[in-house]
Amino acid sequence: MATIKVDVVSAEEQIFSGEAKFVALPGETGELGILPGHTPLITRIRPGAVRIEVEGGSDEFVFVAGGILEVQPGAVTVLADTAIRGKDLDAAKAEEARKRAEETLQNAKSDLDLAKAQSELATAMAQLEAIQRLAKIRSRH
């Protein structure tokens, strides 16, 4: 089967680089699925899980806290604000971040504080959802 080159990069490091049969991720207007030969595309990414189906049928998961997606016929590049490998996701840390964001939301004194708290809450909730999805997939294997 044909493959496509996939790179997932955050400001801190390269998270994934390799060939894939399929990539699924949360685009700005909904879930995107990308196969080799996809039409060129640039879009924003919402916080959530990137699923990379590699050769052999296994999946790699990366949590992204937003960013930009560039698709070319032979390559997919994810430039993430923050990215965490699926195996490195920590439910306790994500839950703590959710609680902190909710507290900040309650005590926001300005529109800027409110917007920041809303963004942090959305990221924490997306991370918790990604952890749950990954746990379900792992329990099937």
UniProtKB/Swiss-Prot annotation:
Family per similarity comment: Belongs to the ATPase epsilon chain family.
- At the top level, the lineage of the source is Bacteria
Assembly with partners or alone: F-type ATPases have 2 components, CF(1) - the catalytic core - and CF(0) - the membrane proton channel. CF(1) has five subunits: alpha(3), beta(3), gamma(1), delta(1), epsilon(1). CF(0) has three main subunits: a, b and c.
Q: What task does this protein carry out?
A: Produces ATP from ADP in the presence of a proton gradient across the membrane.
Q: In the UniProt record, which is one GO cellular component term?
A: plasma membrane
Q: Recorded GO terms, molecular function?
A: ATP binding; proton-transporting ATP synthase activity, rotational mechanism
Q: Which PANTHER family match?
A: ATP SYNTHASE DELTA/EPSILON CHAIN, ATP SYNTHASE EPSILON CHAIN, CHLOROPLASTIC
Location of this chain's protein in the cell: Cell inner membrane
Q: Decide whether keyword RNA-binding is in the record.
A: no
Q: What is this protein called?
A: ATP synthase epsilon chain
Q: Which UniProt keywords apply?
A: ATP synthesis, Cell inner membrane, Cell membrane, CF(1), Hydrogen ion transport, Ion transport, Membrane, Transport
- TM ranges are none
UniProt entry tagged with the keyword Disulfide bond: no
Q: How does it sit in the membrane?
A: Peripheral membrane protein
